[in-house]
């Protein structure tokens, strides 16, 4: 055996294994029979195939009579010759004579050509028939296989090579059958490409029938046009259209050729039939096989087509052009859709259904051409057996072909839906269009089976089980369907239904729950407070904790006239003073304590008893307990603390100066009751004041816990002598930003060290007025003079020069007799405070009026729960 490469080097093989390995090394694609057998069935060992001459056409040594067949594939510039020898036992291999069979393949431009020559030398006596395929018999008239697989690829750029001579020994009287059906599947190159030119491939068959030297042989050439010999690589484009590669040889019908007759599938060459050869008779009708490709408008196969029906009954006419033609691609696509039920029938649970359907297209076509009388069941059985013996690498091309067909099917579905939307009503259809039920019993089971394609076929597995709808028109261009527009169409179809429901959902949160509204009303009523007083509800019950929140249905808006009258009363200075005078001292003491433990039941009983008493009776009732507690309590607790030590030093220095009173001093105070004036309040006041100023500075909040605060309860004057100023809070007690120790010390240094007695009520209520605005000017706070009975003026008033120097306008109150009081709500730096009880004296700089707000103070006091409405009316009448 000799294998010749492009460089002209010859390779000799000593054995069958060496021969196969040599061919594999120098051949890109090779497919050999499983065994090489002779007539006796023994394997042929080619020990001395080529030892005579290095030339390709040399004759080997004589060998025993045998029949051999082989398959050769060529690629690029390689040229191979495979010589098979079949000799009689008495024949001799003389040099110069061709005693065997030689096959060769090469390229000719864009067409794949092969020349077959037969030399029947020395073989007429035994009647042996040379064959070109494995597993054949020598019976005359039997359809034999020529080639198992011949993948022709595009040659590399270079000079065109002429066709190689392929010679085959044939007896003069024996038939030579050239069958186009391959017995094994095609093995294509991984990187192989087919010629881009479309058209038929010409196969030149040359027969030699002389006995003698090869050079004197008479040859007759016939051109066989075979459509599918133009092979296409996976995914390649042919004329702008994706063409699934044809897999197996499909040529003209099988025609038996007798002796000196050569029949072509399509036409003869230009030379015609030469040298007196008779024209070939027309092929028998029985030999004409119906092609497998169906028309584009062919419907799905009926169920009765399965079973004993023949392949011929289910086939259509073959296309005249190659597989790259768009019409051929479309017909293959329709066949693939028709074969899917058959594939599901044999592989119900396999994901290879689509790939197997692609595999059935060329296999069933070839079986139909080889044996038209073969039933469909037998053809499917042979195809399944061939599929099982196919390697995964060989199946790759079918998976890719199935992937393209799946894309075609998805595109067709989308086009059908669009056409239905255009023809149907204007409203959008439901997002999921019902699809046709797949044919065959096992179809529902395969719907859930995805198709696992090796390359980019995973996401497209869902569309594999869809049945083929009837086409409206032939698809002239195969392109991949864009998945995004399809999704947008489905999204738009789902959007309209929820639109009417969205406004209803957004209106629900706008409604406020009733319990939230009620909670808000309760909080506002608790903060504002005056709404309860406006309803006329007794404030005594509020003091006792028995007040219930008014219901919305019972609440009525207050009378504007009543509100204006209340504002008018609160704007009067005497009205607020009268209200403060009747506040229960026990209630104030418990209320201002750090941990109040109020007995509301006992307090309510006391208040009920006091409702029937007059103001004089109230004073007589409350004054003795106050005197006893004032004597028992320590004097330092009555003085207010200083903020720093410097102010206490100045206070101590001024205490000695107060021992000598100024006869011209006077204060705008009202006269004290007889019980108060009978005591030596001057001396006691000076003693208390001096002791108070020697104390260290303490914040009022800390002083409120001391017993002095509880002892310093207000003393109600007689009915004819009422205080005309609200309770006074000290500057130290308020502890506000305006109260600077420097300012206090500055005022003491100027000599304004006169002190006055502070009402205990105002002193105790100082912490309640910390929210009032601080109106202290930059001028120092004046000090009030001491109040003594002998220093009263003609009208019972006593004014200090410091007050006069500061322009303190003191006018008598219209509600009091022969009494003067400082103007309420004036813009003076400080105001004088009346004496509410004996012995309660504090420094003047601490006597900051907490009622500077005027009407605002009255409005705040209006809603104060400390004064009952009945007592307010009594004071208003006075």
Curated annotation (Swiss-Prot):
Stored InterPro entries: NUT, NUT_N
Source domain of life: Eukaryota
Stored Pfam families: NUT
Composition bias type Basic and acidic residues, residue spans: 537-551, 622-631
Composition-biased stretches (Pro residues): 278-288, 427-444
Span list, region Disordered: 273-324, 417-511, 527-560, 622-757, 775-878
PANTHER family associated with the record: NUT FAMILY MEMBER 1, NUT FAMILY MEMBER 2A-RELATED
Family assignment from sequence similarity: Belongs to the NUT family.
Name of the protein described by the UniProt record: NUT family member 2E
């Amino acid at each position: 055996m000799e294998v010749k490469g492009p460089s002209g080097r010859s390779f000799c093989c000593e054995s069958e294994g060496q021969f196969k390995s040599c061919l594999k090394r120098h051949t890109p694609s090779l497919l050999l029979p499983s065994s090489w057998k002779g007539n006796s069935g023994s394997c042929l060992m080619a020990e001395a195939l080529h030892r005579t001459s290095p030339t390709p056409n040399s004759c080997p040594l004589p060998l025993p009579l045998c029949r051999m067949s082989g398959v050769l594939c060529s690629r690029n510039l390689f040229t191979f010759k495979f010589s098979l020898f079949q000799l009689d036992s008495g024949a001799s291999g003389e040099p110069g004579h061709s005693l065997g069979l030689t096959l060769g393949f090469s390229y000719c431009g864009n067409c794949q050509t092969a020349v077959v020559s037969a030399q029947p030398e020395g073989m007429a006596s035994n009647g042996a028939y040379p064959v070109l395929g494995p597993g054949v018999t020598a019976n005359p008239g039997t359809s034999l296989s020529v080639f198992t697989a011949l993948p022709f690829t595009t040659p590399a750029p270079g000079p065109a090579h002429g066709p190689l001579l392929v010679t085959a020994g044939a007896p003069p009287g024996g038939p030579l059958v050239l069958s186009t059906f391959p017995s094994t599947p095609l093995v294509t190159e991984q990187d192989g490409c087919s010629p881009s030119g479309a058209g038929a491939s010409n196969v030149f068959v040359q027969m030699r029938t002389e006995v003698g030297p090869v050079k004197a042989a008479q040859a007759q050439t016939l051109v066989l046009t075979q459509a599918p010999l133009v092979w296409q690589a996976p995914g390649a484009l042919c004329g702008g259209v994706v063409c699934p590669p044809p897999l197996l040889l499909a040529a003209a019908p099988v025609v038996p050729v007798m002796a000196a007759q050569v029949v072509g599938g399509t036409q003869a060459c230009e030379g015609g039939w030469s040298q007196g050869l008779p024209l070939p008779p027309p092929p028998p009708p029985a030999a004409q096989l119906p092609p497998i490709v169906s028309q584009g408008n062919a419907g799905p196969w009926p169920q009765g087509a399965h079973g004993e029906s023949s392949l011929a009954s289910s086939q259509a006419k073959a296309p005249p052009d190659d597989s790259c033609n768009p019409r051929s691609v479309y017909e293959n696509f329709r066949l693939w859709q028709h074969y899917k039920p058959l594939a599901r029938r044999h592989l119900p649970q396999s994901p290879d259904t689509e790939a197997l359907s692609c595999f059935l297209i060329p296999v069933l076509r070839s079986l139909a051409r080889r044996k038209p009388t073969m039933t469909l069941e037998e053809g499917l059985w042979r195809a399944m057996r061939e599929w099982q013996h196919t390697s995964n690498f060989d199946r790759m091309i079918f998976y890719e072909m199935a992937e393209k067909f799946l894309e075609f099917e998805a595109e067709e579905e989308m086009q059908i839906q669009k056409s239905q939307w255009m023809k149907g009503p204007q409203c959008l259809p439901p997002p999921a269009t019902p699809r046709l039920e797949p044919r065959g019993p096992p179809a529902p089971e395969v719907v859930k089976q995805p198709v696992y394609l090796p390359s980019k076929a995973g996401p497209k597995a869902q569309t594999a089980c869809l049945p083929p709808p009837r086409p409206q028109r032939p698809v002239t261009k195969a392109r991949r369907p864009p998945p995004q527009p399809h999704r947008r169409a489905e999204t738009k179809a789902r959007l309209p239904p929820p639109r009417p429901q969205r406004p209803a959902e957004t209106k629900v949160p706008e409604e406020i729950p009733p319990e939230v509204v009620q909670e808000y009303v309760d909080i506002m009523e608790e903060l504002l407070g005056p709404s309860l007083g406006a309803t006329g509800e007794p404030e005594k019950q509020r003091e006792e904790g028995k007040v219930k929140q008014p219901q919305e249905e019972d609440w009525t808006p207050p009378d504007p006239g009543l509100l204006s009258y209340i504002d008018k009363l609160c704007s009067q200075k005497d009205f607020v003073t009268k209200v403060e005078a009747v506040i229960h001292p026990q209630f104030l003491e418990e209320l201002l304590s750090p941990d109040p433990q109020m007995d509301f039941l006992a307090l309510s009983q006391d208040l009920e008893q006091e409702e029937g008493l007059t103001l004089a009776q109230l004073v007589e009732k409350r004054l003795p307990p106050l005197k006893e507690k004032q004597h028992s309590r320590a004097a330092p607790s009555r003085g207010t603390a200083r903020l720093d030590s410097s102010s206490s030093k100045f206070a101590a220095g001024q205490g000695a100066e107060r021992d000598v009173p100024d006869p011209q001093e006077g204060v705008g105070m009202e006269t004290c009751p007889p019980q108060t004036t009978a005591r030596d309040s001057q001396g006691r006041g000076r003693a208390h004041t001096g002791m108070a100023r020697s104390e260290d500075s303490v914040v009022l909040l800390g002083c409120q816990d001391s017993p002095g605060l509880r002892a310093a309860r207000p003393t109600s004057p007689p009915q004819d002598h009422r205080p005309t100023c609200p309770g006074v809070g000290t500057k130290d007690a308020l502890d506000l930003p305006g109260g600077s120790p420097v300012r206090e010390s500055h005022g003491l240094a100027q000599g304004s060290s006169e002190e006055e007695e502070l009402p205990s009520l105002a002193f105790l209520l100082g912490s309640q007025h910390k929210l009032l605005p601080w109106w202290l000017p930059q001028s120092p706070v004046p000090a009030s003079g001491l109040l003594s009975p002998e220093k009263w003026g003609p009208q019972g008033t006593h004014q200090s020069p410091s007050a006069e120097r500061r322009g303190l306008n003191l006018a008598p109150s219209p509600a009091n007799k022969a009494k003067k009081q400082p103007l309420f709500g004036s813009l003076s730096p400080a105001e004088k405070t009346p004496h509410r009880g004996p012995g309660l004296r504090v420094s003047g700089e601490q006597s900051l009026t907490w009622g500077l707000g005027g009407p605002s103070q009255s409005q705040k006091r209006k809603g104060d729960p400390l004064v009952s409405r009945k007592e307010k009316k009594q004071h208003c009448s006075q």
